[in-house]
Amino acid sequence: MTEQIYMKLNDKVKRPTLSKEKINRENKHFKRVVDQYERWCKDGGGYETRETYEDDIIKCLFESDHDGYQLAEFLKEEVYIEPDSELVDILDEVSTIMRSLTNEIVGQWVKENFLEIPSDVVGKKVNAKQGYRKYENHYITGIKPETYEVTVSDDINKKGGWVIRYEDITFLD
């Protein structure tokens, strides 16, 4: 199978991960949340530069829990603010920023490395892994070319399913 041979090259083309250095501060989701956070801080008497507010949100991106309340508590300890429900609502959007930034760098990686998922893989039987979860004897039900991912399901006729990185599947047929 040609796709199996191609996939053995995956150790040469590593999927990028988000790091503080790779954050696009011009990302629309990032800018929107920073704007809201800056407005919230300034309403409470804050007077820092925009870069300071951006750095606070970047710190939140790399916390293990993206729950707005937990991030508000983190910022309370980190930058000495007094959070309220409005801040919690603002910080609830951090997971959206994370997903947007990650999709942005992965999309760039896909373009730079000319990665394509063949359209004929839909319907093929695969085993897949995602973190500690394994999906055995599943079918590819869809393709997400912009992020080099596929959806897999145990039902071949299902639309959608679990989203798995293409390099983490093994063809069975």
Residue map of PLM features:
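Short intrinsically disordered terminal tails
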Residues: 1-4, 117-121, 170-173
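Basic/aromatic-rich interaction segments and small domains that mediate binding to polyanionic partners
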Residues: 129-166
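Mixed-charge, Lys/Arg-rich low-complexity intrinsically disordered regions
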Residues: 85-122
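Intrinsically disordered, low-complexity, charged/polar segments
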Residues: 100-115, 155-173
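N-terminal intrinsically disordered, low-complexity, charge/repeat-rich segments that act as generic
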Residues: 2-84
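Short interaction-hotspot residues at assembly and binding interfaces
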Residues: 78-93, 143-145
